[in-house]
Design a protein with these regions (language model features):
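Double-stranded RNA-binding/processing signature
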Residues: 1-172
Length: 172
């Protein structure tokens, strides 16, 4: 894949061009590729996913805290968890075209429904390393919450735990 094409695709998704594209390449590399660096260590998006998960929690927590000034901790925690839950991240990755950029060995992508959400988190980790916390904040506010997710709608949406439990029990 050419860097120029990737730069353009990332610009479409992120709203800015990367400074160091290597972070973003790694963020889009699923472990099924089995790529190794010169020292023989695996190169994939798992570490960036770990970092992105933590940064995403902080950024979304910050946004929720600012957006709902009079709300209690329980409401804020619940709202943040709804915004960063796996289903939400998978849906965002699909809608934004992140899934199409992930390098994997075809077999795993069809069986791993979390791959897109994991790549989304890894991209947040890449943004953080490449451009810092403020860039992650801008990305979430301008690209995600302003265009793709209504924070008030998510915050006040009731989660039907009974139907979730039934759904889970039927799958397992």
């Amino acid at each position: 894949r050419k860097d120029k094409e990737l730069y353009f695709s990332l610009y479409e998704i992120l709203g800015f061009y990367p400074h160091d594209i290597s972070y973003y390449k790694m963020a889009l590399m699923h472990k099924s590729i089995m790529h190794r660096n010169a020292k023989g260590k695996p190169v994939n998006n798992e570490r960036l996913e770990f970092l992105g998960d933590a940064v995403l929690d902080a950024v979304v927590g910050d946004i929720v805290y600012q957006h709902f000034p009079g709300k209690r901790e329980g409401f804020l925690t619940n709202t943040r968890s709804k915004l960063v839950q796996r289903d939400t991240l998978n849906k965002l990755a699909q809608e934004m075209g992140i899934n199409q950029l992930v390098l994997s060995n075809g077999h795993s992508s069809s069986h791993n429904s979390y791959m897109g959400g994991n790549a989304f988190e890894a991209l947040v980790g890449a943004i953080y390393l490449d451009r810092g916390y403020d860039a992650c904040m801008q990305f979430m506010q301008k690209r995600i919450l302003a265009k793709m997710i209504n924070i008030d709608k998510v915050a006040y949406k009731e989660v039907n735990f009974k139907s979730k439990l039934i759904e889970w029990s039927q799958k397992n």
